[in-house]
Amino acid sequence: MARLFSLKPLVLALGFCFGTHCAADTVAAEEADGRVAEGGAQGASESAQASDLTLGSTCLFCSNESGSPERTEAAVQGSGEASVPEDYTRIVADRMEGQSKVKVRAEGSVIIERDGAVLNTDWADYDQSGDTVTVGDRFALQQDGTLIRGETLTYNLDQQTGEAHNVRMETEQGGRRLQSVSRTAEMLGEGRYKLTETQFNTCSAGDAGWYVKAASVEADRGKGIGVAKHAAFVFGGVPLFYTPWADFPLDGNRKSGLLVPSVSAGSDGVSLSVPYYFNLAPNFDATFAPGIIGERGATFDGQIRYLRPDYSGQTDLTWLPHDKKSGRNNRYQAKWQHRHDISDTLQAGVDFNQVSDSGYYRDFYGGEEIAGNVNLNRRVWLDYGGRAAGGSLNAGLSVQKYQTLANQSGYKDEPYAIMPRLSADWHKNAGRAQIGVSAQFTRFSHDGRQDGSRLVVYPGIKWDFSNSWGYVRPKLGLHATYYSLDSFGGKASRSVGRVLPVVNIDGGTTFERNTRLFGGGVVQTIEPRLFYNYIPAKSQNDLPNFDSSESSFGYGQLFRENLYYGNDRINAANSLSTAVQSRILDGATGEERFRAGIGQKFYFKDDAVMLDGSVGKNPRSRSDWVAFASGGIGGRFTLDSSIHYNQNDKRAEHYAVGAGYRPAPGKVLNARYKYGRNEKIYLQADGSYFYDKLSQLDLSAQWPLTRNLSAVVRYNYGFEAKKPIEMLAGAEYKSSCGCWGAGVYAQRYVTGENTYKNAVFFSLQLKDLSSVGRNPAGRMDVAVPGYIPAHSLSAGRNKRP
């Protein structure tokens, strides 16, 4: 919920104690001291006059070079004398008269001090019979970082009630600033008060670029609740939102109430959502957001969050009763994430995702969300981590079944469900050796394929011979797999197995030298590495393929013993990987700045196990070259590149190169090109994948155009498709004082082979209060690597380039 403001009750500031030390015979002795402070008190009182009861200028684009609020402490003048004893009050003035225990009047540069609070005023009357103090024509009160100024104040010290007129307040606590003006301020006793005709914001002094205007505000500090009636949000002098009633917390704690609406526009028309927040308990809250999407209809969003020392979670639900655009009913998206720490060694969790139909992401999300949500995860798990048999044991039990969404042609490639999986990994150190065993039992289920169970047991032993200059790590293992397959398609049930030995040796060394680079001292390393791997070739075409897939060939694959993901396929290997990498480390901190590497694999046998399980022949004696380079150059430039080069055909199979320039926060230039000669593009209607060249250029930038205005752009172009994949352009503005920031963004992106979607959204950030519209940060982080929202940049940092 938006945190509007928090006021201190005046009873603490004006709790005067007129004792015998304020008697008439003492007043005369203090007159001389009062004249010393006359100049300061007079100036403060004059500044307190509220001749124009406004927060300041409503100009949105006025310059403020300082960008910082004035200090409230300078507006009140103290007496300069020793501190006042607790519960005693000091009055310093040009003139004082009256009778002790009846009435006292102080005039001329009046300074009243009590318990750290200081009050400046033109005159003050204290009626001891009614225990009431009246001050005017102007007053200024300073206490605990809060400055309250006004014209007149009448206050009953005993009942803690009173009224002030034309009141202006400024406060700063915990780095958060608040200023307000009110026609009247009624003190209702015991921390309760009422403000009428009030305006407030969190901007610098005199800045009213935005504010909240209310007919009245009632606050109860004991309950920590404030209630505003007939409140409007005003931006640039123009009211944007109105509510007849709103409540809010005074102490910064969460409070049930309306949140700021969200507004956007796009291919589906204008969208509006009005959320309401329920603070159900300190560890339990909920949000309900009814809304409307212009061309689709009413929507209802809900979220529940809970947090306990031993468990936490979140549930999200979006429901569209009737989609006018598609004609579908009851479209929805549901999510539930839960984690439970049952004990120090036992954890459990749930990850559940589901949508109503396969077109949900295409209709309501962008291209990246569409590509990343083909198989929606639905998983329940239980994990154990502890000690057993003198070693470390990690075990788990899980059940997993995906919701697979069909492509636009109606075809979907659904993975097997895991019903269930039980896994365990145990290892124990014995000197330089480590012995261990991994085991996994999985029951696979599928509506249209053969079901079965798989047991994998993989015992092994490895040694670690390492020192300061390098390492040698040999390993011996035995990979055993057993299947129990159900009858399917007229075939009887059967059992089958596979046992393969695994031998590999990983070794490397490190050479270092101190040098100078990028204007400072660095350490450069040269790290050659060898990896020998042996696994005999064995036909596996009689084994099912429940979860194995090919991995793309890159630098990391040089050191994998199995190039297939999953346990159904194990490659044949009699090869030696040779590689060398170099790193640049900061000479003072050891932080890595840059690394690059290149490597190749040499084959001693030509056997190869294919994905279908058959054993084929690899006519090559060595693999393609793979290389990479990534890191920072000179503190401003970044590089991230990789290549897979086919030396036989003398062509690149795949490469990507990206460069970035980031001279300062808020200044980002990115360029990235990606090429793949034979990439998996999309799933066709017949169930096969379409492979083609992938050639894409991605340009993005965030750059200041003026001191306050920045541009954000992204252009992602597909050369093979001969069309843009995504285009984005936006402008962000931050006020000079940082009181508010705003952005407007337009986006066009691909949702299918021949379909696009357009979107326009805006955001308005209000300092220390809330945001209006959609928060662009998450989307921009992906679109523009290195992006920082303009309102998050320090004032004055966004200089003209």
UniProtKB/Swiss-Prot annotation:
It comes from the Bacteria. One of its GO terms (cellular component) is transporter complex. The keyword Membrane applies. Keywords: Cell outer membrane, Membrane, Signal. Its main location: membrane. It is found in: Cell outer membrane. One of its GO terms (biological process) is lipopolysaccharide transport. It holds the Pfam family LptD. Residues 1-23 form the signal peptide. The keyword Transferase does not apply. Belongs to the LptD family. Component of the lipopolysaccharide transport and assembly complex. Interacts with LptE and LptA. Together with LptE, is involved in the assembly of lipopolysaccharide (LPS) at the surface of the outer membrane. This is LPS-assembly protein LptD.
